[in-house]
Amino acid sequence: MRYTILTKGDSKSNALKHKMINHMKDFQMVEDSENPEIVISVGGDGTLLQAFHQYSHMLSKVAFVGIHTGHLGFYADWLPHEVEKLIIEINNSEFQVIEYPLLELIVRYNDNGYETRYLALNEATMKTENGSTLVVDVNIRGKHFERFRGDGLCISTPSGSTAYNKALGGALIHPSLEAMQIAEIASINNRVFRTVGSPLVLPKHHTCLITPVNHDTIRTTIDHVSIKHKNVNAIQYRVANEKVRFARFRPFPFWKRVHDSFISSDDER
């Protein structure tokens, strides 16, 4: 089994990485950061997001597993004291692969049809560069839906619906549903300007095209990465064809994670 380990960079996570590497020498495991079969993230959800983007070019060939050295995360499901058990599981069993939907966004520029494509595991946001009111036309399936005015828009995946989307009042969506969700960020609603005022959940075959009005410099965030785009014509969002693959060695139910993170954990009862 070819593996690689990425850490948060703190002393606790780095020490755990070295412990795992030494333990893996007793097994038929080869450290290979160029072509791993399994990527082990040590830290938290932020570390796993970084690992996802580092290996987003080979998602069909790699599976991710997370070890959390801080707070309980939605992606990191193993604890530091369980690493030896995890290594044994990796070597002794055929692990189950769970696939989650991803978000695709294509930024189209006014420069001779030039465009760039990105994938997001959690969400992508769209705002102006300087924090002024974002004015955009929202088109769904090729039809004009609304003209949005506000701070911005957040487009999330089902697994990312528990993150920024939840703080915006969006719905929590089970990752088995191939969908994306559009949530408003401080929309302007009065007698003159109106938006739908509710999160929208779009299925896989629906495409959302957002076109800036009177400004062509847009700042997007793609998970933890912030990017400034100049001369933007439009940004297209849809459920990606690719999926992220997680290695599962034991049950890790989505709704239990939601309960433990936002209501109470088992050890608090």
UniProtKB/Swiss-Prot annotation:
It catalyses: NAD(+) + ATP = ADP + NADP(+) + H(+). NAD(+) binds at D45, G46, N122, E123, R149, D151, A186. Keywords: ATP-binding, Cytoplasm, Kinase, NAD, NADP, Nucleotide-binding, Transferase. The active site is at D45 (proton acceptor). InterPro entries: ATP-NAD_kinase_N, ATP-NAD_kinase_PpnK-typ_C, NAD/diacylglycerol_kinase_sf, NADK. The keyword Nucleotide-binding applies. Belongs to the NAD kinase family. This is NAD kinase. It comes from Staphylococcus epidermidis (strain ATCC 35984 / DSM 28319 / BCRC 17069 / CCUG 31568 / BM 3577 / RP62A).
